[in-house]
Amino acid sequence: MKPSLPRRALLLALAAWPAAWALPRRRLQFPRDFGSHPDLRTEWWYITGHARSGTREFGFQLTFFRSRVDATQTLQSAFAAKQLVFAHAAITDLQNRKLLHDQRIARAGFGVAEASATDTAVGLRDWRLVRSASGGYQARLPAADFALALDFVPTQPVLLQGDAGLSRKGPQPEQASYYYSEPQLAATGRLTVSGQGFDVEGTAWLDHEWSEALLHPEAVGWDWIGMNLDDGSALTAFHLRRADGSALWSGGSWRPKGAEARSFGADSVRFQAERRWTSPRTKAGYPVQWRIDTPAGAFTVRALLDDQELDSRGSTGAVYWEGLSELLDATGRPVGRGYLEMTGYASKLQM
């Protein structure tokens, strides 16, 4: 899709960010913090999941981003692009071994794009994610070759990541975000793939994260997993990488079903690549199988389809890998499914 702003002007505006500052530790307040935080630079709402329709299996991903444009904040014009909204959507069709994806971008306002500050209600033209007063979510994202029309119902409490919702992302205090998850969402609805509709049921994971700064100057990207286990547990793990592949920072959490979450320390999570896939389009090499050691145990994460690379250079400017994967325990037994995200392999991630 063609951006609503000239690409060069957009990149120059985003490059004009001032120095970041450390986020204060604070108690997240709901439902207010389900909404947007336009005073901070970057924010996203992200839902991934696994769904079935008879013998057919699918993965799905939808993400809405909000980005503050600092270079325009003092402009008086009502047409100044002070906030941008981006959106990505994708379906992984396991039977046909293919990924369908789409992207959008627009300046906030004028009835085109919005991100409510009172609760989750983000939209970009006819793409929408809205939270109801009962706590459920409704996602409607029609695209050219596919469509998502899904409803999500929480089955567990909100999971505050890091230190009561303040999640460090690097060795310096300003490298942090406010971050919560809603794992084990019950998902129902309809997926349309190449004109064919499927009534589906499944399980999903929601992340909502907002920050003034995320990446240390040495970080080129990150690897992240959000896994819904079959027994109702939830596993989060991530690390940020330097250019040589070494870990700059790591973290995550483990929440058994019905129990309190346990946050992982910065040195307690280790990612080890076990198998790589090279994209025929970008020539980027992605580890599509990982061994991940955590305080909750050792796990293997294995992509269910190697080619789940997304080219979002028409919106956020990044090429990344985001895909449905399975989780195996230390004995090799499948124990859950979720999504693996890998950034910074095609080029250094800019945030």
Language model features by range: what are they?
Residues W21-M351:
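Structured soluble/peripheral alpha/beta segments that form catalytic or ligand/cofactor-binding pockets
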